[in-house]
């Protein structure tokens, strides 16, 4: 099936997540960069029903993409700094406060890591800025609907606001790595000049989560790790 080319104005990440995670479709890559206005779907219906199935799939996808476009346009009207202020109403943990409080801790920690651990005082300001805004997209419409895009949308919105590349790249990638696999961390080529900034912010986020939740009594057990602390610890080791 296909969809209106006007939707190609949406970030490719939004298009792909909508098709893959929400509709279970396969996006189609364009000959050059980006996606084509087409998708593939698998069905177990009789071949004579293929055209009707395709039309229904196009209709459902178009509705999802219209929603995504609405969120995209609405979110860009509000700067990330204002979204950051709204994090005061988003709870991180009952004993550790809001995501605004977590962001404040991350800002201080990321600056210290960049300067005193990684030895890059020149990256300290960018690390602090990125850490401050890293969770701001949790207060956006897009992430409210597409939770799997958290971090990614923050980076995209930061890029739209023309924040420095090391800042938006660090925000975009700060949840990574999410597994111990060698390919789980972003490649240095993708991070460019922002590799140190990303490392400082990602470490600050993971260390704040691990230490804070251990202090709050949320230690993982052999059968229970609801906050993914083992995964966070693996992430710290992969970054280092």
Regions found by a protein language model. Name each.
Residues 1-240:
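Amphipathic alpha-helical "coupling" segments that flank catalytic cores
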């Amino acid at each position: 099936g296909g969809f209106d080319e006007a939707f190609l104005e949406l970030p490719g990440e939004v298009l792909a997540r909508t098709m893959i995670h929400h509709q279970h479709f396969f996006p189609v890559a364009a000959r050059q960069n980006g996606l084509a206005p087409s998708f593939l779907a698998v069905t177990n219906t009789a071949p004579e029903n293929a055209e009707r199935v395709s039309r229904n799939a196009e209709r459902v996808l178009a509705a999802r993409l219209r929603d995504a476009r609405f969120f995209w346009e609405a979110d860009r009207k509000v700067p990330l700094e204002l979204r950051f202020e709204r994090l005061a109403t988003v709870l991180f943990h009952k004993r550790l406060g809001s995501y605004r409080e977590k962001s404040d801790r991350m800002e201080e920690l990321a600056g210290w890591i960049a300067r005193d651990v990684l030895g890059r005082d020149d990256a300290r300001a960018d690390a602090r800025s990125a850490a401050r805004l890293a969770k701001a997209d949790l207060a956006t419409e897009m992430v409210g609907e597409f939770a799997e895009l958290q971090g990614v949308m923050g980076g995209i919105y930061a890029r739209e606001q023309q924040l420095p590349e090391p800042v938006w790249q660090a925000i975009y990638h700060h949840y990574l790595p999410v597994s111990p696999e060698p390919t789980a961390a972003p490649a240095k080529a993708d991070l460019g000049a922002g590799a140190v900034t990303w490392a400082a912010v990602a470490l600050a986020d993971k260390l704040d989560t691990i230490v804070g939740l251990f202090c709050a009594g949320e230690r993982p057990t052999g059968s229970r790790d609801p906050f993914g602390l083992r995964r966070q610890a693996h992430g710290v080791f992969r970054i280092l």
